[in-house]
Each structure stands twice: as C-alpha cells, then as structure tokens.
C-alpha cells in the first residue's frame, strides 16, 4: 500500500515513514457497479482513493434527474473538502463500474497534513482543482449542447486518454443535457469525423476540432457586462 500511495498526488509529498503510517490505517473495499459508497448529507469520516474502477459523485435534482459533478478515475483522491471542514458529504459517491476504493480516516489524514506542510499544500491544490471543475460545470448551463458535450469529452480525455469509457447516459448526466440530445450531438460529431463511438465508449479522433467548438464567438447583438473593481488608496495585494 505504501508503494502505491507513493505514486499518487498528494501522498507522494509525504516521507516514506509518514506514508507507511498512513498505509497501516487504510482500508480497501470493493463495490459492485451501481453500489453507493456514501450519500450526500452523511457525516464525513474519511478521504477516499480509487484503486481500480471509476466512481461518480452525483446529486439528485428536484425533477428526479441526476447531475454528475465529478468523475473519479483510478488513482484519484476525492472528498478532501469534508476532510478539511468536517462537514457532511456534499454528494453521493457511486461506483460507476466494479471498483476498489481505499478509505483513509479523517483523523489519519489530518495527522498527515499537520506533520507535512507540503502534503497539506498539495491537498489544498487538489481541492481547488475540484472546485474549478464544479465552477466550470456551473458555467456550462449557458452554453449550447454541442459546446457542453465537447467540453465534457475533452475534460474526460485528460483522465482516460483518447478513448472515454462512458455511456451516453453518463455523458448526459455530466453535461446536464438529455440522453436524446447527447446521442443526437454525438452522432453529429461522428458524421463530422470528430469522434468514433462504440457501445459505452467514445474515441476522440480530432480533438483540436472539438476544442475549436469551444471558441465559437458569441452571437451578434449579445451583450457583455464588465464590472470594474477599484481598490482603496494605499491597498497592496498579498
């Protein structure tokens, strides 16, 4: 376990001795596809790492639809925020495929942060990255389906490589669009030669062209508001 943790962020910033102490109190558990690891609102008691498989962090909307806020791939750590503020889990964690997840108690994680400032710094950076992802997802509600789906595919390709192993329904839940719109948009991408698709998999063939879809200019006549903030005299940042 210590050797495996040494390959992962943020644990590689710990000394071998600290990693070994952490490894001694970790627990592995296997979850079948669709099984819930924890639920939103449940008291947070651990930080989690995906050892094998894939975990989705999900919220259920008032209309019954599912919104996937984060996709956790093999080797990724999740739920650092509850470890920092000890507030309840903000989302359900569900095994998207058969998965093995490593559980690290909040107490052990806190102890490691207190003893290793570099580990704490990397943990905060990891949290900031996740916060940025959620912010970007929130901004997508103002974008057309084509741009949303292109952004989702490009983001997932950074985790999984050129072949993204998610179903149309899973992509729809991330992009915040319907299954039908997702399928229709992916078929259009396929006809344009941007992707190839098979059951449960989408391969990015021309990622640069997908990226270009994100740079589409705003429609003529649209308004942009700019707010200028002025600092008081004598103010110095930092």
Task: State each model region's role.
Residues 1-33, 77-78, 82-83:
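Cyclic nucleotide-binding regulatory module and flanking cytosolic helices
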Residues 34, 45-58, 73-75:
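Glycine- and acidic-residue-biased ligand/ion/polar-headgroup-sensing regions
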Residues 36-42:
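Short phosphate-coordinating micro-motif centered on Lys-Gly-acidic
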Residues 68-125:
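Cyclic-nucleotide recognition modules
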Residues 96, 114-179:
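Polybasic "coupling" helices that flank or enter modular domains
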Residues 167, 203-222:
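Short, cationic-aromatic polyanion-contact patches
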Residues 188-189:
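Basic amphipathic alpha-helical segments that dock to polyanions
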Residues 193:
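Glycine-centered, phosphate/nucleic-acid-interacting loop/turn motifs that mediate DNA/RNA or nucleotide
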């Amino acid at each position: 376990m210590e050797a495996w943790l040494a390959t992962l962020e943020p644990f590689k910033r710990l000394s071998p001795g600290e990693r070994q102490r952490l490894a001694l109190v970790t627990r592995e558990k296997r979850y079948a596809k669709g099984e819930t690891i924890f639920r939103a609102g449940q008291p947070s008691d651990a930080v989690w790492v995906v050892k094998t498989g894939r975990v989705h962090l999900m919220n259920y909307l008032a209309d019954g639809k599912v919104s996937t806020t984060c996709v956790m791939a093999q080797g990724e750590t999740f739920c650092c925020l509850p470890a920092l503020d000890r507030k309840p889990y903000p989302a359900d964690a569900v095994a998207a495929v058969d998965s093995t997840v490593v559980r690290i108690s909040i107490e052990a994680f806190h102890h490691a942060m207190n003893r290793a400032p570099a580990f704490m710094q990397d943990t905060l950076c990891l949290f900031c990255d996740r916060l940025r992802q959620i912010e970007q997802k929130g901004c997508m509600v103002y974008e057309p389906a084509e741009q949303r789906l292109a952004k989702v595919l490009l983001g997932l390709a950074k985790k999984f490589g050129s072949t993204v192993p998610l179903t149309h329904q899973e992509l729809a839940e991330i992009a915040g669009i319907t299954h039908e719109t997702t399928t229709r948009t992916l078929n259009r991408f396929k006809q344009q030669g941007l992707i190839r698709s098979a059951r449960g998999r989408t391969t990015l063939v021309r990622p640069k062209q997908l990226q270009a879809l994100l740079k589409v200019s705003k429609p003529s006549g649209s308004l942009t508001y700019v707010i200028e903030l002025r600092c008081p005299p004598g103010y110095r940042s930092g």
